[in-house]
Amino acid sequence: MLNSGSLIWLRIDYMALTMMGKKRGMIQLFDEKGNAIVCTVIQAEPNVITQIKTKETDGYTALQLGFEKVTGKTQHTIEARTGKPRLGHFKKAGVESRRFLVESRLDSTEEYTLGQEISVDTFNGIEFVDATAISKGKGYQGVMKRHNFAGGPASHGSGHHRHAGSTGMRSTPGRGLPGGKKAGQMGNERVTVQNLRIVKVDSENHVIVVKGQVPGPRNGLVYITQAKKLAKKKS
């Protein structure tokens, strides 16, 4: 259990299905009180079941989902873009080639079959979700942008306006300790945002609208799963 301000965060021990979708952009909506809320639109075309794992054959129970068909002008192009190992995998499942795969551990897979499509209706009745994506790459950045350092003096004549400052000590230990905050590659890493409230599930257009920001650029791949923590107000 984690305490944070006036909320108590409870870790939920369960296994939930993970779907894949594409971030289509951000919009502004109004809640029932007339307050403007910033939302992210995620379009999740039906994910297809490409493999069902069981304890007898694999040692654990899980579902593997595929997302976004591999496209090409000819069948040869599609097969070349898929690769022979995956071609055999999809052929065994009886589904068309998919670009992305994700596996979700579940307590039971009895209600699922190979080739079955999983739609956004899965999230009907769910209030919060977690979203995982690759964040936007910012390239090589300094410590002020990357780590929010204050920087040096801004006055004229100072030679270290945006420098990091001291990075170590003297003869003891005589080296810079590893793990220090320095300039370097920023972004382009796997980021998870937890407890995004679902504002709307549009089954007809395969869209989920969540309150808040989701990592990554427009049209970036997003993994969506039921929230692993639930927030409850302190009694």
UniProtKB/Swiss-Prot annotation:
Domain of life: Bacteria
Residue ranges the record marks as coiled coil: none
Chain ranges passing through the membrane: none
Entry-linked SUPFAM superfamilies: Translation proteins
Keywords annotated in UniProt: Ribonucleoprotein, Ribosomal protein, RNA-binding, rRNA-binding
GO cellular component, one term: cytosolic large ribosomal subunit
GO biological process, one term: translation
PROSITE patterns: RIBOSOMAL_L3 (PS00474)
One of the record's GO molecular function terms: rRNA binding
Region called Disordered, residue ranges: 150-189
Similarity-based family: Belongs to the universal ribosomal protein uL3 family.
Function: One of the primary rRNA binding proteins, it binds directly near the 3'-end of the 23S rRNA, where it nucleates assembly of the 50S subunit.
Assembly and interaction partners: Part of the 50S ribosomal subunit. Forms a cluster with proteins L14 and L19.
Listed name of the protein: Large ribosomal subunit protein uL3
Native species: Protochlamydia amoebophila (strain UWE25)
